[in-house]
UniProtKB/Swiss-Prot annotation:
SUPFAM superfamilies: Nucleotidylyl transferase, P-loop containing nucleoside triphosphate hydrolases. It catalyses: (R)-pantoate + beta-alanine + ATP = (R)-pantothenate + AMP + diphosphate + H(+); CMP + ATP = CDP + ADP; dCMP + ATP = dCDP + ADP. PANTHER family: CYTIDYLATE KINASE (PTHR21299:SF2), CYTIDYLATE KINASE/PANTOATE-BETA-ALANINE LIGASE (PTHR21299). The active site is at H51. One of its GO terms (biological process) is nucleobase-containing small molecule interconversion. It comes from Acaryochloris marina (strain MBIC 11017). This is Bifunctional pantoate ligase/cytidylate kinase. Residues 293-525 are annotated as: Cytidylate kinase. It is found in: Cytoplasm. Catalyzes the condensation of pantoate with beta-alanine in an ATP-dependent reaction via a pantoyl-adenylate intermediate. Beta-alanine binds at Q75. The keyword Ligase applies. The gene is panC/cmk. The lineage of its organism: Bacteria, Bacillati, Cyanobacteriota, Cyanophyceae, Acaryochloridales.
Amino acid sequence: MDNVPIIRTVSGLRHFLRCFPGNLNTGASPSSTVIGQIGLVPTMGALHAGHLSLIQRARQENQCVIVSIFVNPLQFAAHEDLTEYPQTLNQDQALCQEQGVNTIFAPSTDTLLADAPLTQVIPPASLTEYLCGPHRPDHFTGVATIVLKLLNIVQPTRAYFGQKDAQQLAIIQRLVQDFNLDVTIVPCKLIRDATGLALSSRNQYLNAQEAQQATILHHSLQAARHTFQGGSCDRNSVLATVAQTLAKGPQVEVEYIDLVDPVTLQPLEQITTQGLVAIAARVGSARLIDNMLLDARLPILAIDGPAGAGKSTVTRRCAQAIGLQYLDTGAMYRAVAWLALDQQVEVSDPFAIADLVEDCQIELKPHADPQQQPQVWVNHQEVTQAIRTPDVTALVSAVAAQPPVREALVKQQQRLGRQGGLIAEGRDIGTNVFPDAGLKIFLTASIEERARRRQQDLKNQNLPPQTQSELEDLIASRDQQDSQREFAPLRKAYDAVEINTDGMTIEQVITRITTLYQERFPDRA
């Protein structure tokens, strides 16, 4: 087998991308995990298991995977380890080959930085005034500049970054937001070795004794989590625990410990939703960073699957059984349809509907009776009953078919999910709306089983019957339509638990999901 190609020029990479075959939705099945066309994994080389975990996820989620290898001089200060940074291109190429990478983009410094002085990207000061920022003053400007160049050159659908570099991740997410870049930044979990040491290319600088000493960083974070889980959510208690543990490592020279908001990177006095405990320390010649997210929120449960798999009924019942808020996404689309009628906006006009939905605020409040529909407000006007009228019902499908509506409502759903404690169902909840959901379920059933259930529903509702064969054809057609639609196709999240409900009662399905939830979150059950 030929080695994965190494492309060193921008023109060469663009030629490769033009020639790469494939359409995202051609031949896709509902259980496919492919949700992007091009996945980019930016690295500085010296690949290790942490990098490989990013590549493996990119391989599961994209048709084409590109790994960039560039030791970026802009992010190194004069006294730092640019010249010593490990470069192992042949070994990296072999690892990429094993993981099914399509190509490596390994430009030279002259290729990316030929026209110095370079136009640079300066992140907001609020994102660099704490953690590593004061200790590495120009580092994040260098990172943001090169990442923006890579995103522009590769034009990926999705780009993968590790959560070990939490400050870098927050800055890149903000960069994508501020520059309106059409790419999804995918945070990937921090990978540790058997001792708990966070994997890093700079771990190569550690001798055996130093590597053992370095594990105390993780031990201190575990101690912080224990303190947090014991009910101490204030800054002083959490950081004192970290400091006390780190003090037991005589070879560990602490640069900083801090507790910050994981998005704004501003210091926290109290963890009310999420807090990031971050450490930087020197062990021997190696500068090491590590972090841990402390989450006070209830988890989010995402349920996806094809039509007719029983998602709606199961999701509502699970919400009641577990104690999560059911996020009625259908009510949100009804709210937009009501607003379009109220404002006399033509729903077939994508520009008018985009303007309408961009400025509207939808609020949902659970009914005291979990069997009842939630209360709904649009722009502070209560519309719970108004969105259930026949006129609104007749308009919902046309409204939901507009990509601007879906895009805007996904943002609002994500806003509602910031406090956690939600359960939602759909076709892209776990892949698009809540990709960081604590538990993802892909609920499915055979076409034959779904047709049988539909036949029974028709009978129970005294509706005209259809044959099993007719219903199977309709369901197969719906599956194909949902999995091959251009915008938000039905996909199984790479980390979803698949439950085939053939032969299962609703009660059995609910028991299976609630058991999974209790096993994953024993302290929240």
